[in-house]
């Protein structure tokens, strides 16, 4: 654990804390823009959106549990469900840590394929 922490801190020092925050802001915005382009709605108001995780409202007719299963089994991507009263109302995409722009692009492409399989008729081409 101590070695892993040392490696993580070295990586942070190398990138620089300001650059880390900029990267997270860029990835958060990229995720939100991509999700909206697919015809989905962001759960949080734009001014309150997180740069570490994006919560997406599950559209009517979409089985959120099935969507998460498809993403994991067919694309190797884990989406988190909502918690407590939001369990069946949202799913979450994490983009904190060592996440790249290419990984966000892959996630969005996979989501575009998986959504219709889970009942979403509104995927934009």
PLM ranges: what are they?
Residues 1-29:
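Structural signature of PLP-dependent enzymes
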Residues 11-17, 33-44, 60, 64-65:
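PLP-dependent aminotransferase class I/II
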Residues 12, 53-55, 92-97:
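Short glycine-rich or small-residue beta-strand-to-loop segments that form or flank ligand, phosphate
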Residues 16-23, 37-46, 82-83, 119-125:
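Flexible, glycine/charged-enriched surface loops at secondary-structure junctions
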Residues 25, 41-74:
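Conserved PLP-binding catalytic core of the aspartate aminotransferase-like
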Residues 72-79, 112-118:
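A common structural junction motif
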Residues 75-89:
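Short glycine/proline-rich, acidic loop/turn segments that cap or connect secondary-structure elements
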Residues 85, 89-125:
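PLP-dependent enzyme catalytic core of the Aspartate aminotransferase-like
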């Amino acid at each position: 654990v101590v070695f892993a922490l040392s490696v993580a801190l070295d990586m942070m020092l190398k990138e620089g804390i300001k650059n880390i925050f900029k990267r997270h802001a860029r990835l958060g915005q990229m995720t939100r823009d991509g999700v909206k382009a697919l015809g989905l709605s962001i759960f949080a108001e734009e001014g309150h959106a997180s740069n570490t995780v994006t919560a997406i409202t599950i559209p009517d007719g979409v089985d959120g549990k099935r969507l998460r299963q498809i993403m994991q089994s067919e694309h190797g991507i884990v989406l988190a469900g909502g918690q407590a009263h939001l369990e069946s109302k949202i799913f979450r995409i994490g983009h904190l840590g060592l996440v790249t722009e290419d990984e966000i692009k892959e996630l969005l492409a996979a989501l575009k394929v998986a959504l219709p399989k889970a009942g979403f008729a509104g995927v934009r081409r």
